[in-house]
Each structure stands twice: as C-alpha cells, then as structure tokens.
Amino acid sequence: MKLLISIEYRTRWGEQLVMRIGKRRIALQYADGGVWTGAIERYTQSEDTEYRYEIERDGACIRSEWRPHTLRLPAREGVRTLRIRDRWQEMPSDTSFYSSAFTRGIFGRGKTGSPKKATGNITLRVVLPTLRPDETLAVAGSGRELGDWKRIVPMDDSRFPEWELTLHTAHRFEYKFLIADRKTLTPILWEEGANRTWGELPGAGEHALDAAASPRFPKRRWRGAGTAIPVFSLRTEEDFGVGEFYDLKRLIDWAAATGQRVIQVLPINDTTMTGTWEDSYPYNANSTFALHPQFIRLPAAGVVEDDEYRTLRSELNALPEIDYERVNGHKLRLLRRAFERHGARTAARRDYKAFIAANRHWLIPYAAFCTLRDETGTPDFTRWGGFARYDRKTVDAYCRSHSRDIAFHCYVQYHLHTQLSEVCAYARDHGIVLKGDLPIGISRTSVDAWLYPHLFHMDSQAGAPPDAFSAVGQNWGFPTYNWERMARDGYAWWRARMAKMAEYFDAFRIDHILGFFRIWEIPTHAVHGLLGYFNPALPYSADELRGMGFDTQGGRYTTPAPDEHTLGELFGDLAGEVRATCMKEGRLLPAYATQRKVAARFPGDDEHQTRLREGLMALLDDVLFIEDPRRKGYFHPRIAPHSTHAYRRLDGERRATFDRLYTDFFYHRHNRFWQESALRKLPVLLSATEMLTCGEDLGMIPDSVPETMHELQILSLEIQRMPKTPGELFADPAHYPYFSVCTTSTHDMNPLRAWWEEDRELTARFYHEALGIGGDVPYFCEPWICRRILDMHLNSPAMLTILPLQDWLSTDGELRYPDPAKERINVPSIPRYHWRYRMHLPLEELLRKETFNESLHDMIACSGRR
C-alpha cells in the first residue's frame, strides 16, 4: 500500500519536518501555506504501528511531538493508497484528561468490544478525552450519508479517547461535531464556528483519513471527590487483622455510592526487614517492585479456612489497631502451609509462568534477598559475607540450592499481583481511580540497593529541612540518588518502577516532588536534618566566603566552638562534665565529633544520658557552614542558622553579610539550576506511563517548583493549614488552582478533630477568620463544623478534593471515632513511629449507613463534583 502524508506545521528557516515510523525516517517536503507532504511507496506492515513527527535542525532532533500517532490500515479491500491528513500533536493545556485516570477510569468506556469494521472511503479521526461515559461525540452534516443535517451519527469510541467515523461518499459535504446523549443521541453541545467542509474526495482504490480536525468545544473543568486511607487501615469482616487488597472492593462500592471518584492509598510495597512492628513504616520498602504480603487475602491464596484460621481471624479483627507482628507472623506461616499444598500445581499454570517471565528481573533477586535476610537474620546485605555484593552467577547458584524458599516468595507475589489486579479492574469497571504513592527514597537495606548500588549515594541520607513537623529536620535514612549514573541508561530503573506501578494505579502522588529538583542530603555521620544540604547545589567556594569575610580555614564556622555561655545554655549543671570529658582546648574530642558517635556513646533513656546526648547533638548542630563531602573547599550555609549560638556571636556587620549570602543561597542562587535539574528527569519519568501525576509540593518551595509543575501539568497539593502565600495563616480553598489536589490534611498531620484540639489559640483564629463565625469557639470540632470545613474544600476550584476517611466520618456524630487522637496515622517528629491505625467500623457496616451515605452524596453533588 502507498501512503501519502500531509501535515500543516509552521517551521523556521533551516528546520526540517520528518516522520519516524518504526525504524524509518521520512523527510517531508515543504509545499505551500505551511503544509508538508511525504510518501511511503510500499508500506507492508499490517499491524497497527505508532509513528511521530519531529523537527530537525542540522540533522539533530530539536522538537518532538507530545504523543505518538497510530497508523491503522483501512478495512476495505482493494485500497491501494491511503491519504493521511495529520496534525502536529502539541502537549495540550489539559493533559490530565489524557491520563489513564480519565481514559480508563473516570471517563472510561469499559468493555465496549472490538472496533466497528467500517468499509467506507473516508475516515474522520478525533482525539477527545473529556466526554463522560453517558455522552458520545457525533457528527451531523449534509449529504445522504449524514442524513442532510437531520440525523446525529455517533462516532466509534472503542479506542477511547480516540473517536472514529468512516463514511462512504462520492460527494463533497459539510459537517460539524457535536456532543450528544449516548442513549438518545439528543444534542448536548454543538461545536463553535463555521461548518467544516470535506473537499477533495478519494479516487478509485484510495482511502482518505482526516486526523487533523480538532473539535471546537469550550474547555471542560471536571471536578471530583475522593478518599485517602492506607490499605492497612481498612477494615472488613473478611480480613485478617489488617486491611487487605480485597477490602478495596468494599471501599470502591462505598465511593461509588457516595459519588466519589478517587481512592488514594499509601505505598503498598513489602517493608519486611526485621519481622517486628518497626517494619510497619510504609516508606521503607525492601523492594520498589514487590507487594507487601500483609495485604493478601489468605483463602484466595490457598489457605484453608479451618478452625485455627477462623479463631485467629476473629481475634485479630477484634483489635482496635493492627498487631503488626502477630498478623504478619501468622499470615506468612499459613501461606507457607498453603504453598506446600498448592505450590506445584500453581507453578504449572500458564498465568503463573507468564507472571514469572514478565517480572523475573526483580522477582528472583527479591526472593533471594528475602531468603538471605531470613537465613542471616538481617536485611543488611553488607553483613552477608560472600553475598554482600550482588553477583548474578553466585545468586543464581544460591537460588538453585534454595529453590523451595525462592518458589515460596514467588508464589506469594503471584497471588498478591493477581488479587490487586482484580481490584484494579473492579475499580475501573466502577469508574473509580486508584491513586498510589511513589516514595522519594529507597531503603539502604533493600533489593534495589543490593542490585544497583551504583545508582545511589550510599554514603548519604535523604531527609528534609526543619519545618512544622520537626524543628531539627527529618532524617529518613534513605540513600540519595546518583542521577548522573541513572541518566546514562535513560533512567531505566525509574521507568521500570513507574511501569510496574501503572499495572495497578491510574494516578499517583510523587512523595516529596522537591527531590527531583534537589534532595536534602545528610551525611551518614549526622542524625539531625539540620546538618544537611541540598544536592545538587552550587555551594560557595572558600575564596567566595573569604571575600565576604568568612574564613573557614581550621574548621572555623564548620565545627562547634562553644563558649562558656553556650555550654551553660545547652548543658546547665552538666557543663563542667562535658568540658572535662568531651572536650579539649575548646573543641570536641574525636570520640564525640559526630552525632552518630554521640548516639552510640549515650544510648540510654535515663535523664543523665538523655541530657548529654541531646546537648551534644545540639552542639554539633551549632555551625554556620557545612563542607560539601564531594567537593572539598566548597561550603553550604547551614539551614535555619539564626537560632544558633554561632550566629548570635557574629558582630552586626558580619551578621548582615551572612543574612545576605544565606538569602541569596536558599532563595535565588539555585532557581534556574534546580529547574533545569528537574526538567532533565521528570519528563522522562512521566512519559513512561499514562498515570495522572500529582505532586506533594509542601515545605520550603523555590519559585522554580510551581513553574515546572505548571509546565509539566503536574497537579499541586493544597492544604488549608499549610498556606503557600507568605503571610497567610490559612489558605483560602476558594483560591486554589484548578490543576490541584485539595485536602484537609496528609497522613503526617492530625485529622480535623484532633487538630482542632491541638492549639486552642490557632483554632480560635481559624473559627473566626477562616470560617467567619463569631462568638465562643466550640471546645470540640462538632459534626456541623466538620461539615462546613469539608464544604469549603468541596466547593474549591481544585480538580480533586481527596479527604481522609476520618474527616468524612467526622461529619456524623454517631459514626465518628470516639477518641480523635487515635485517628492519627503518623507523627513525623517521632523517628520510629508505629503505623497501626485502622478504621473503627467495618466497611460492610459503613455501606449500610444509607442516610449518612446519601448525605455525603448530596454534599458532593451540590458542590458540582461528579
């Protein structure tokens, strides 16, 4: 078949438009009026094929389309020539609607069957993702085929968001696109502007495809609501002491009943390290690919529902919170038993073999990691002797000698994948979007760090500067990314990670999106985030600092140099002991020179050791500059230095100089630098899948972050208690941007009711200023107050209002949990927090609360969300 291509594109002098299809490069020829044409004389590919247009200058690609086209040959026999009229696909201003959250979820068409086999001689093809499932794109026009404007002809949406209509005509005709009711074909909205005209008709043996049309409809601003809750926090009558993947089905039912469209969860990867409750932290996965065994529904994985099972399930489900150790211990024991019974039969199944083949690259190393972890009693692979460094041949031999254990872990992951895939399909069938969470870090004792240590800075820790959550900053302990090494293979690890996530989710939250601009990196010898610095960064050279009056030679300004006043403030009556045992000539002895050494020296919880430990930690924080560990002689100003003794000891002129260099460093020096850093990474990662991308952009935000998120159309996160406008105490939801996610709190914050009791003075200001209510402030956050706050958020312009389940329940005096303090999921200021919150009533009971559910449905509908 011969292909004749034409496309309109206004190039600049010296630019060349080319078509890339398969391995071919077709240089198009410039005609008149900005039109480029080209031909493929013999096209023999019968399957659908993707292609793109690119702009070249001097033989190099300088611009490419946002997404590919699909070439499909006409079904009609005898076609020898296909004429294609194309259009350049620029990134639209509403790319969110092109995500799978909309095309497969909210506006998804479900199982529409195979595309209609049309045998006409012309085809209209349009991409339009913003139509609801009860709507159809249609055409009306002149001529017999279109009923002389008296008929509404629906287009085929079996490849939604692509629409097609094939006609057979021998005459020119006029037409228009319109949106119609799917069932009745009653017109809802006609496109704007003059009628369209089909001019040149195809000749004998020809077929014409017009893919250049763009319907002229006003931009639609759909808004929806959703619920945020960790999977482990769900409760049903069928689970085993912890929320499970299958529990999401009941939550999906409830979301559909109340008019919600999104369910947002926390990370679901396996965090098993020690087998203790410390593994409950969902952001410390042992694999960024493997799913956590705690989420499995045991009977569906072959576990027999005998008396032992029923007794354990009853005991564990009766607990108000998760007993992490008992739940996971019993689950793994029962799964071992099921594997012994069903493992061989399962391994023979075709879908099991397909799962192994598709996931072998991470699954087998993960299974080996788990087996070695259990065998050695530690996830710290640096203590595994001959296995400390991953070697494929050595590990393959180990897997052969431990084949039963390897097969067991594969068996569990297969069932987890099967169950979650079933839930994912169930959500899409109900028009509900599952939104996942992409942690910014990986564990230093994980499969990923074991396999790919070159992709990470194992000598550093990721964290966050001081904020409302923690005065000394946060230290997450994760190694930071070696972006330079990752770039060498086009970020293959990230692309694989994203692709795996997209198997289950149609939207995701980038945890700490700032990490793609710059990460807060802390040396491994430090404990507090205060001793961190940004990476990448442009630290000051020693010469620059010297020119500003700060000579760092001899450790001045970079190591603590306390005077008597400082020691007295930090240690009180212990100052003499510190001076005598921990210091020499005004400096700390080497044994106390780092925070890790101090923590090891004073591990006790008694008052004496605690005071010494905390005082020495604070003393080590008391510096003005931190030397860059990879660039000796270059220095970062310490974050939040104004409360340090070192800052207070500066004279007035030097203090003013420091303030200027500090402000320049943190608020001006890096803006373009960090933006360029993010734009090298984020587009590659976002293009790896079709998921809707949302960013957690809270905290210390440089100007380049919202600019970049806007450019890449990543939804921002808006929280009333964490305003982004300087000087505001509370943000106004009425002023949130459309492309954003609006919520009352995150899992790191108190839900509404507990927050209400947190700071009475702040609550009073919120009551009077944000809610605009006079008089005495209620002591408790009464249901009517909660409802009013939720109404504010639902009526915001934000595309998505996703609220914690606790806050939805807070609007009902009978359904809300008696103790608001028990509803908190995490306290970031506590490094090893026990994550064990579970909703207090089963979802089956919540589904039966018809009056409550109808009230939520009405509240959501009245806000215009659907």
Where on the chain are the PLM-derived regions?
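Catalytic cores of glycan-processing enzymes that make or break glycosidic bonds
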Residues: 98-116, 123, 202-866
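Low-complexity, Pro/Ser/Thr- and charge-rich linker/hinge segments at domain boundaries
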Residues: 72-89, 198-219
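Tryptophan-centered motif/residue detector
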Residues: 36, 58-64, 76, 84-89, ...
